[in-house]
């Protein structure tokens, strides 16, 4: 659908007042783009004919325009569906009727479709006038009865008086209000102001004028938007014709005196343009004439103009004298040039070129995506037949599908009727430009001024000009477009006028040259009078000028002044004659060359047509030409019956190759192609013995067909050179030289097939393919050898094939084996003077002897201990009691999963270590050992000096061990090193003299060993200490994991934080006090209890509230040491005791642990005596970890203030054990009490 809502005509001229408005002139044709609903201003586009011009768009008052009248009706003779500009062109079908509004451009008509009521353009050569075209009266009636655009238009009954002319409506967007349209200045081309415009005619009166108004049109050769009127409209107006002719070129000559510049030379010359020709006449030299299409380029720069012509080639640089003249010449050249190369003409030419049609002769099946499947009898459009002579791009008429088709399958159809109608349409459009105008006589007389011109036509032209007095006539595109108010005479163009002098020199006249005929020179004087002067009366200079203009010799009219002048003139004329002869010869040579090329092309085309017709006469599908992309494709064409083919071939004297190929076993679809190739190469029957593989391959035969043909020829001529070959001989990969399929036999079996055992397998019983079989050479899988076939009947033959035929076994998924523990991590720690090394356990695969079961198992599965990559080392993290170390009992290490175990006032559980139970060190209560993360398991041995116990720390002002993670400088201590003991101040402090360990200094109290995780000096189970200093109050142990503990007052309590910043925000920090080496007591009303947190900020806001956030938070809200709370996390038992300050007077707390069975008897009793005589302890710790009743092993007694009691038992080794923390299998050693020593109490 187009964008045009209607076609309107300007009734009055309008000058725009704002930039968005459009200037229009009377009778301008307008396309309506948009109607306004709020005011009377409509958006229109003005019709301008020309290739380089842009049609302006703007607002106009709706009262100044009306619907354009219909000139005539036309009917479509062809379908037009492929529009190039859908916004302006209409699609239509044959026999559609249109109302024509404008036909000034004969190639594109502005119409309205009576079918769809759409407005737009249609190609002029696609339509023809409808029978019984509209008469002048009907046109006048249609023009008068056309509805007015707005109610402001004049009524149909009466003519609008000039005094009733309405001003245009006010624009809403106008900045200032206009007083009245009547006050606007009239256009200089108009007769008067808008109110003085005559009323529109009615149907009953002034029929002729209405017809004139309806038919009047304007030529639009100017490419300037301001060229809105044409002075020659009325001059070329023909009231007796229904069709207004559109003259393409202005036949009036324009000439200017210019100066030609050649380097530094300047030559005077004259430039004339008219009748579609450009004449350049130098003052001295040969004049040149070119048609407007020979002008290749034209340009100007101020006063200079540059023209370039071809045929003959000439480049001119002209100086016009002033800028106005240069611009005038450029505009006139632009008019002629634009009219000659109007793109509308090219569009019509492309549209008029109908698509080349063709009829499919044979069926063709597409074998690739770019090919098109066609059937015999289909009609196709041949889109491209030049890119390839063998493959044409075609489009099916019915479905519209396009693709490549073999050219020989298509028969082009030459639509003579369509071609003739197209050509006739173009010829008619050309004839309209020149035959429908009364100016044809003047155009013809001027275009043939160099031939036998008729002065009667010139007089007729003068009469026409006289009759057209008072009408507008266009002189040039840059003239002022002014009308001659007193146009009683037609005056000559002053720029073309020159001074004419008679031969005597007496008379001189300023006139314009019109023409020359019958010995007379016709001149147009400056006063408007036209005269005819005898040629023999004019001077020789004037005659020479006429010769230059017309190109004819006037020697017989010139005066014979002397022999020299005659000789000069004769030489010039001879030179001119030779030049013209030379040009004529060049043109003739070019013409002959073009004709020869056309003849050769025509001859080649005829040869192709003959070849195609010869192939079609055979009534056989032609050969499909090979394509580069498909080397093995076979054209699937409809097969021709063999009988018909043979009968046709038998009619000639040629050998029937088709039957030959059929006898050879070639497929029928390929027989025809091979037959045509053999016929083209003129192969006869007597050439059969000479046919070989290379010849057949050259002729396009396939490899399989080559073998078939050669076998047939060998059989026919009895050639035995490739007779039977032994069975063990090899041919090519799939066949033997005799043509039979290759049957591979094993080297050891060379027996004939008759001697081989016969089986009933289909593969073995299949007979060998004979030479006569048609499908012998089709692609088949390679045949199995006899040996392989026979071997499949038996299970195994002992050959390599048995191994190849075996299927791979599916591996069974083995159960996840228990990882071997790292034995280095399980190396025991000694507390005596002798180190008993652990027996090495092989990490090889498990032996036949099963590993002993774990007697302390707490679950239902017998799961051996696993090593998870690290060994958990014991550490102490809190408790308000000073750590006291016991060196005479069993040390029971404990490992935890995911939870940090703390004991602050209870008894540690006992776990299996080897074959016995070893209680862990007890320092002020049962200490739960803690594991280390990311640190090597380095267990330092307890030290024995003189067989007695070594007090590691005194009980006053002790500093608790610190444990830190990710501290640089990791240096692990070797296990089993003996640390000497030093006594400083109040207690003995062990030191390591075997490795570089920092010494520990104490300045205010006794230091307790520190445990560091990842620190270069680590001590997790012995008496070795890192380098903390105690300079004031007692320091509680700190354990930090990438965190900075803060304390705001008093003694620092142990803190354990993982990526958190513990803060103490309340409660008084009570300093530790040392009272004579006895146990320091703490005030429980505000003393801070150690906090252990993972990734959280633990705060103590008052009172006595220990927290453990290793997956569990324990709180105590008051009182003294509650009962212990037991936690089970991850399969290991974690015991946390968060009791307060340990009482020294007969504690009554008993901690009992049962994790796997019934309640067991207590195994250990730990007694503390921190001052005075030994009191009866009331605290009993009972452990049961496996359901087996354990006997009490020992009683640990500490006396730190009174008499030292003798230990009841030698100190045993500290074994790191636990469920899942890298503990290896149980050792197979046995205890022997007879071999027991101080360092080996069980006698392993």
Swiss-Prot record:
- Positions of the UniProt region annotated as Disordered: 130-248, 415-497, 558-592, 610-649, 726-791, 813-853
Compositionally biased tracts (Low complexity): 140-159, 199-214, 629-649, 757-771, 836-851
Composition bias (Basic and acidic residues) maps to 171-184, 568-592, 610-621
Its record classes its membrane topology as: Peripheral membrane protein
An example Gene Ontology molecular-function term: identical protein binding
Keywords annotated in UniProt: Actin-binding, Cell membrane, Cytoplasm, Cytoskeleton, Endocytosis, Endosome, Isopeptide bond, Membrane, Phosphoprotein, Repeat, SH3 domain, Ubl conjugation
| Glycyl lysine isopeptide (Lys-Gly) (interchain with G-Cter in ubiquitin) cross-link, renumbered residues | 471, 548
- Biased composition (Basic residues) is annotated at 429-447, 471-484
Name of the protein this chain belongs to: Actin cytoskeleton-regulatory complex protein SLA1
| Phosphoserine modified-residue sites | 447, 449, 454, 799, 996
| Modified-residue entries (Phosphothreonine), positions | 831, 858, 887, 904, 984, 993, 1075
Per the database record, which ranges form the SH3 domain? 3-68, 69-132, 353-415
Q: Please list the residue ranges that the record marks as compositionally biased, kind Acidic residues.
A: 226-235
Function summary: Component of the PAN1 actin cytoskeleton-regulatory complex required for the internalization of endosomes during actin-coupled endocytosis. The complex links the site of endocytosis to the cell membrane-associated actin cytoskeleton. Mediates uptake of external molecules and vacuolar degradation of plasma membrane proteins. Plays a role in the proper organization of the cell membrane-associated actin cytoskeleton and promotes its destabilization.
């Amino acid at each position: 659908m187009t964008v045009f809502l209607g076609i309107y005509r300007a009734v009055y001229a309008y000058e725009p007042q704002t930039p968005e408005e459009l200037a229009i002139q009377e009778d301008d044709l307008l396309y309506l783009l948009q109607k306004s609903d709020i005011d009377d201003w409509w958006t229109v586009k003005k019709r301008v004919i020309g290739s380089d011009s842009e049609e302006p768009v703007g607002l106009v008052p709706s009262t100044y325009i009306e619907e354009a009248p219909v000139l005539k009706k036309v009917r479509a003779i062809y379908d037009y569906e492929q529009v190039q500009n859908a916004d302006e062109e209409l699609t239509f079908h044959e026999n559609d009727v249109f109302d024509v509004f404008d036909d000034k451009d004969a190639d594109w008509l502005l119409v309205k479709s009576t079918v769809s009521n759409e407005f737009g353009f249609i190609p002029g050569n696609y339509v023809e006038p409808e029978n019984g075209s509209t008469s002048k009266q009907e046109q006048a009636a249609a023009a008068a009865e056309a509805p007015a655009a707005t109610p402001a238009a004049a009524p149909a009954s009466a003519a609008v008086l000039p005094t009733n002319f309405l001003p245009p409506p006010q624009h809403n967007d106008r900045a200032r209000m206009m007083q009245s349209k009547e006050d606007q200045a009239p256009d200089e081309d108009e007769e008067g102001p808008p109110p003085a415009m005559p009323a529109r005619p009615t149907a009953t009166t002034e029929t002729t004028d209405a017809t004139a108004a309806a038919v009047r049109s304007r030529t639009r050769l100017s490419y300037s938007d301001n060229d809105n009127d044409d002075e020659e409209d009325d001059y070329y107006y023909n009231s007796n014709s229904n069709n207004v002719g559109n003259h393409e070129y202005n036949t009036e000559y324009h000439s200017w005196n210019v100066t030609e510049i050649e380097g530094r030379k300047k030559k005077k010359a004259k430039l004339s343009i008219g009748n579609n020709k450009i004449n350049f006449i130098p003052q001295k030299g040969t004049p040149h004439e070119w048609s407007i299409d020979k002008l290749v380029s034209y340009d100007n720069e101020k006063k200079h103009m540059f023209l370039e012509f071809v045929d003959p080639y000439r480049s001119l640089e002209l100086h016009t004298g002033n800028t106005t003249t240069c611009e005038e010449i450029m505009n006139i050249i632009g008019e002629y040039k634009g009219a000659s190369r109007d793109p509308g003409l090219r569009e019509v030419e492309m549209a008029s070129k109908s698509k080349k049609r063709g009829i499919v002769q044979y069926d063709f099946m597409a074998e690739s995506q770019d090919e098109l499947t066609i059937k015999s009898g289909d009609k196709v459009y041949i889109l491209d037949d030049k890119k390839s002579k063998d493959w044409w791009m075609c489009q099916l008429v019915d479905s519209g599908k396009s693709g490549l088709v073999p050219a020989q399958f298509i028969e082009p159809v030459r639509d003579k009727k369509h071609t003739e109608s197209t050509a006739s349409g173009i010829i008619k459009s050309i004839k309209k430009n020149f035959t429908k105008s009364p100016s044809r006589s003047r155009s013809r007389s001027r275009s043939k001024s160099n031939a036998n011109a008729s002065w009667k036509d010139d007089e007729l032209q003068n009469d026409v000009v006289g009759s057209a007095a008072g009408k507008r006539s266009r002189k040039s595109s840059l003239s002022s477009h002014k009308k001659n108010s007193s146009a009683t005479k037609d005056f000559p163009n002053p720029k073309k006028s020159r001074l004419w002098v008679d031969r005597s020199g007496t008379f001189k006249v300023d006139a314009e040259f019109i023409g020359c005929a019958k010995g007379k020179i016709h001149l147009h004087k400056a006063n408007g009078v036209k005269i005819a002067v005898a040629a023999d009366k004019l001077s020789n200079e004037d005659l020479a000028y006429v010769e230059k203009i017309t190109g004819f010799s006037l020697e017989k009219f010139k005066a014979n002044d002397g022999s020299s002048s005659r000789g000069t003139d004769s030489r010039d004329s001879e030179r001119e004659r030779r030049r013209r002869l030379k040009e004529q010869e060049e043109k003739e040579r070019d013409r002959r060359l073009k004709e020869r090329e056309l003849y050769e092309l025509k001859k080649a085309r005829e040869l192709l047509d003959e070849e195609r017709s010869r192939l079609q006469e055979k009534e056989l599908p032609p050969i499909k030409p090979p394509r580069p992309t498909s080397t093995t494709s076979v054209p699937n064409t409809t097969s021709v019956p063999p009988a018909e083919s043979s009968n046709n071939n038998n009619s000639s004297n040629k050998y029937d190759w088709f039957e030959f190929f059929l006898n050879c076993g070639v497929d029928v679809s390929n027989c025809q192609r091979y037959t045509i190739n053999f016929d083209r190469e003129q192969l006869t029957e007597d050439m059969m013995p000479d046919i070989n593989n290379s010849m057949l391959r050259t002729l396009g035969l396939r490899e399989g067909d080559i073998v078939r043909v050669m076998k047939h020829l060998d059989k026919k001529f009895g050639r035995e050179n490739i007779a039977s070959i032994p069975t063990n001989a090899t041919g090519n990969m799939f066949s033997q030289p005799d043509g039979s399929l290759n049957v591979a036999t094993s080297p050891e079996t060379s027996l004939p097939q008759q001697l081989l055992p016969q089986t009933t397998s289909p593969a073995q019983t299949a007979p060998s393919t004979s030479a006569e079989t048609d499908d012998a050479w089709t692609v088949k899988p390679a045949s199995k050898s006899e040996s392989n076939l026979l071997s499949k009947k038996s299970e195994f033959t002992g050959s390599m094939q048995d191994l190849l035929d075996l299927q791979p076994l599916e591996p069974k998924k083995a159960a996840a084996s228990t990882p071997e523990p790292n034995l280095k991590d399980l190396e025991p720690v000694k507390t005596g003077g002798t180190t008993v090394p652990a027996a090495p356990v092989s990490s090889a695969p498990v032996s036949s002897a099963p590993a002993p079961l774990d007697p302390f198992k707490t679950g239902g599965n017998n799961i051996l201990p696993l090593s998870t990559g690290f060994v958990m080392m014991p550490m102490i993290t809190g408790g308000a009691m000073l750590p006291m170390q016991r060196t005479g009992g069993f040390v029971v290490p404990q490992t935890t999963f995911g939870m940090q175990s703390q004991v602050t006032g209870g008894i540690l559980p006992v776990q299996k270590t080897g074959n016995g139970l070893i209680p862990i060190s007890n320092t002020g209560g049962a200490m739960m050992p803690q594991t280390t993360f990311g640190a090597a398991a380095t267990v330092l041995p307890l030290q024995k000096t003189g067989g007695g116990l070594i007090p590691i720390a005194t009980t006053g002002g002790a500093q608790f061990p610190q444990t830190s993670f990710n501290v640089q400088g990791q240096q692990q201590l070797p296990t089993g090193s003996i640390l000497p003991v030093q006594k400083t101040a109040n207690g003995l402090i062990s030191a390591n003299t075997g490795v570089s360990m920092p010494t520990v200094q104490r300045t205010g109290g006794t230091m307790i060993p520190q445990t560091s995780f990842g620190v270069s000096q680590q001590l997790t189970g012995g008496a070795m200490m890192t380098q903390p200093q105690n300079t004031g109050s007692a320091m509680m142990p700190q354990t930090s994991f990438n965190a900075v503990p803060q304390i705001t007052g008093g003694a620092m309590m142990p803190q354990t934080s993982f990526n958190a910043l513990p803060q103490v925000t309340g409660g008084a920090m009570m300093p530790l006090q040392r009272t004579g080496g006895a146990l320091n007591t703490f005030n429980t009303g505000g003393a801070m209890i150690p906090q252990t947190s993972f990734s959280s900020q633990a705060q103590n806001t008052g009172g006595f509230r220990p927290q453990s956030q290793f997956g569990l938070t324990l709180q105590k809200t008051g009182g003294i040491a509650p009962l212990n709370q037991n936690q089970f996390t991850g399969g290991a038992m974690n015991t946390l005791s968060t009791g307060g300050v340990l009482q020294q007077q007969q504690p009554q707390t008993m901690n009992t642990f049962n994790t796997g069975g019934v309640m067991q008897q207590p195994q250990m009793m730990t007694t503390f005596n921190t001052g005075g005589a030994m009191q009866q302890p009331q605290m009993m710790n009972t452990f049961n970890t496996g359901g087996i009743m354990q006997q009490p092993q020992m009683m640990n007694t500490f006396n730190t203030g009174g008499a030292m009691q003798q230990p009841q038992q030698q100190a045993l080794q500290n074994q790191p054990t636990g469920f899942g923390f890298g503990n290896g299998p149980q050792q197979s050693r046995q205890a022997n009490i007879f071999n027991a020593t101080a360092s080996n109490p069980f006698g392993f």
